[in-house]
Amino acid sequence: MDFDKQLFFNVEKIVELTEQLEKDLNKPNLSFEQIKVINKELKHKQPLIVKFKELQKLVENANEAEQILNNSSLKELHEEAKKELEKIKASLPSLEEEIKFLLLPVDENNQKNVIVEIRPAAGGDESCIFLSDLFNMYKNYCTSKNWTVELNEIIPASVGINFVSFAVNGTDVFAKLKFESGVHRVQRVPLTEAKGRVHTSTVTVAVLPQLEEVEITINPSDLRIDTYRASGAGGQHVNRTESAVRITHLPTGIVVACQEGKSQFSNRDKAMKMLRAKLWENAQNKQLSTQADLRKSQVGSGERAEKIRTYNYPQNRITDHRIKLTINKLNTVILGDLDEIIEALQADEKKQQLEKFIS
C-alpha cells in the first residue's frame, strides 16, 4: 500500500524520543522545573502519538489485507481483503493530513494571557464611538469563553472612548485574540450625521501576550516610576490617594500607565505586565525589521485603506480581508459572536503553516 513512508519514519522517531522522556520522569533528583518542562512536552506530543498509533494500525491492517490478496485462493477472503484495503486507502490521506498539522510548530505564546490596547485612528468622534463598540464586543466574547477581563486604563472622549487597555486571562487566549491585531474599519451613518451619509472610520487594536518575569528581564535601574492621583468616574479617588502608576522604560522610551486598580501596588503590578508585553512587541518588531518579508508594525498606520476587517452597518456585513471572508451577521458579531471569524482565521493559519512545512 502506498503511504508517506518519510512521514511515518519522522513521526516514529518523535514517538521514540517521547517514550524516552516518559522514562526520564522516573529519574531521581529531577527539579520541579525539569518535571514541569517534561510534562509540558509530553502533553504537547500526546495528540500526535494517538494519531500515529492510528496510522500504525492502518498500515498493519493494510499489510495483512495485501498478504491475503497475494496468497489466498479463497474468493470470500479475497473480496473481504479487497474491501478492507479500499477502506484503508480512503481514510489514509485525511489521517496523514492530521499528522502533518500536528507536526507544525506551535506558537509558544498561544497559551498565554494577553493585554489588549484599542486606539482611535481616522474618523474623529465616530472612531471613538466605534472604539467603545469594539471594547464591548471583546468583553462579551471573553465572557462567552469564561475568560476574565481586567481594566488597566481607560481614557474617555467627549463621545465614546479615546483609549482603553485591558488584560484578558483564561485558556488559549492569545491563540484566539492574536488575530484581532490590526486596523478595524467601520462604515455607517454616525449619530451626529444630519444628512444620513455613510462615514468611514478606523480604530487600531494591538494584542500582546502577557510574559512572565523570567521571560523578559527588566533592570530596575532602567525604570522611572511615577505615582499620581487616579481620576476615576464621578471623582473617585480624586485628590485622595496617589494610587495611579506610570512607568517609563528609559532605554526604549516606552511608557505604560495604570490607574484602574484599587491600590498603588495593584496598579504597579498591572503596569509591569503591560511593560513586559510592550518590550516583547518592541523585540519582535526589531526582529521583523531584519527579515526579508518586512511588514508593518502590528496595528499599521490606521489609514482607512489599511485594514484587516470592515464592519458595514448599512448592509449588516462584516468582511475579514485577510482571508476574504464575508458574513452577513454584523448585528451578532458586534455583540461578541466572533467564533466563526476566529475559527476561519485559525484554519487559514494552519493551512499556510502546512504549505511552508511541505515546501
UniProtKB/Swiss-Prot annotation:
InterPro entries: PCRF, Pep_chain_release_fac_I, Pep_chain_release_fac_I_sf, Prokaryotic/Mito_RF, RF-1. The modification N5-methylglutamine is found at Q236. Keywords: Cytoplasm, Methylation, Protein biosynthesis. Methylated by PrmC. Methylation increases the termination efficiency of RF1. SUPFAM superfamilies: Release factor. It is found in: Cytoplasm. The keyword Protein biosynthesis applies. Pfam families: PCRF, RF-1. GO terms for cellular component: cytoplasm. GO terms for molecular function: translation release factor activity, codon specific. Peptide chain release factor 1 directs the termination of translation in response to the peptide chain termination codons UAG and UAA. Belongs to the prokaryotic/mitochondrial release factor family. This is Peptide chain release factor 1. It comes from Mycoplasma genitalium (strain ATCC 33530 / DSM 19775 / NCTC 10195 / G37). The gene is prfA.
